[in-house]
Amino acid sequence: MKPSRGLSLTDLVNHDDAPPLNNGDNNVKQEEVQAENLATNPASVLAPGPVIVDTLPPVEAPVSTSDTGNTSHTGAAPQTAVTAESDETDTDDEPGEIVFENTKFRFDDEEQQPQKDKLVKGTSSEKKDKQVNAATKEIQLDSKPVKEQSPKTKDEGDIPVEDADKADNKVETQKKENGIKQEVEPVEQDGKKSVEPAKQSKEDSKKEKDIFQQKTSNASVKNNIKKDLKILSELSSSSLPKRYNVPPIWARKWKPTVKALQAIDSSNLKLDDSILGFIPEDDLTKSVQDWIYATLIAVEPELRQFIEVEMKYGLIIDPSTSNRVNPPVSSQCVFTDLDSTMKPDVDERVFDEFNRYIKNLSELNENMGKFNIIDSHASDLSYRVRTHTERPKFLRMTRDVNTGRIAQFIEKRKISQILLYSPKDSYDTKISISLELPVPENDPPEKYKNHTPTGHRLKKRTSYIHNDSCTRFDITRVENKPIRVNNKNEKEPESDTTYEVELEINTPALLNAFDNIQHDSKEYAAIVRTFLNNGTIVRRKLSSLSYDIYKGSNKL
């Protein structure tokens, strides 16, 4: 038996002209329709799930009436397996369904025949490709056959193609809106009927996809486990976690963003004295500079050349206790108690050691020619001369012991003094400014030959003159001899020996800087500062020698 094709739209339009089928041949036609559906719908064989194809019940031949008489005629459409339903079959309870999935509608009757020829003449490979494409398309869309009723025909003529197309679309939209469930029909595969829901194919496809996804997910899980094991091995290999070795930014100590100090080249370091380019004077030095300046400016200009600025070492004595003062200070300062006095004197062993130290210092190679050393042995006689019209004068006559000549005859006037207390050192300091005025020629020394002196001092002195610092170091051993009064029966008192260390500033250099202070104050400040620096060196050296001798305990 020749296989029949599927019902086309042309057959539906011309269903009135189709001849009726014989009742005896209904079963045969039914099998031909199923075979034709399998031939035209290969997706039912290739698809993993069942393809639903509705079988059409036997249809009686339509009866057409005309005005001349009730005559009926039957005729089979060429190459059709099922005839179109009449108007009477539209109201049946179980109408047959028409398959449109694999049927291409042609609106031109002339083009349909060549298309049939192409389908018949197509190669087996093309048919196979089309079958595979149709099967995959059906799987993806998960399409189900929809029951569709053939459009009603009119008695006068055929239904236009456009109206039939609109009717089909309207039926489909209504079914989608109303949620009509499509029936599942059995399909013959290899001579066996298998009825499975259309959802099974979708679940099978999802299972296949889930298998591939599960494989990829298993691989990613294994990779993540390997990464975690690697991180754990790295953490176990180190003694501490990384966050302790490299603390986070919020746990680090603050560091200034300016890195100017890091840019300093320590190999060739040149520091400025300060941001202004000079060293500011400390308070003590500034106080002494101001004090000297105020004293000099108070002296008459013609007498300034006889000024003597001396620094001596001793202990500041409290008159109430006859002991060294002990103010509540911890560093060197200016002591302003006017009742306190200081007697210039140092310990004999300290004096000898310091004299040896200065001598060795002057004999160093780098100091050769910088020191001028002068030894002298003189006798000083002091006189207090009092007149009715003038204030008392203190005269001092200096005579060379070795030659007996008068070396100096002067009037000494004390102008001012300042006491510097040094709690960390063994000795304090006194800076005094005095005038050593020469006695006029009309008042010769012989005039005071019969006068009784107020003091007699034998001085054995060694002077170290350092011109580069404008300082003279006098290391003097003084023997104070008592003065005998007219009572000859009294015993001569014992002499008192003191050891004095003095520093004297170069007066011409000081006065020169003082005169130019308005134009250049740096020279004056430098001379006074250098004088104080030398005094600090001497004071600290005396303290260190005293510590070495007495093991840190001061001899008071």
Curated annotation (Swiss-Prot):
Residue spans of biased composition, Basic and acidic residues class: 103-131, 139-212
Keyword field contains Manganese: no
Catalytic activity: a 5'-end triphospho-ribonucleoside in mRNA + H2O = a 5'-end diphospho-ribonucleoside in mRNA + phosphate + H(+)
Composition bias type Acidic residues, residue spans: 85-96
UniProt key word Membrane: no
Comp. bias (Polar residues): 63-74
GO MF annotation list: mRNA 5'-triphosphate monophosphatase activity; polynucleotide 5'-phosphatase activity
Name of one Pfam family that matches: mRNA_triPase
EC number(s) reported in the record: 3.6.1.74
Annotated localization: Nucleus
Requisite cofactors: Mg(2+)
Subunit comment: Heterodimer. The mRNA-capping enzyme is composed of two separate chains alpha and beta, respectively a mRNA guanylyltransferase and an mRNA 5'-triphosphate monophosphatase.
Family: Belongs to the fungal TPase family.
Protein name per its UniProtKB record: mRNA-capping enzyme subunit beta
Organism encoding this protein: Kluyveromyces lactis (strain ATCC 8585 / CBS 2359 / DSM 70799 / NBRC 1267 / NRRL Y-1140 / WM37) (Yeast)
Lineage: Eukaryota, Fungi, Dikarya, Ascomycota, Saccharomycotina
Name of the gene: CET1
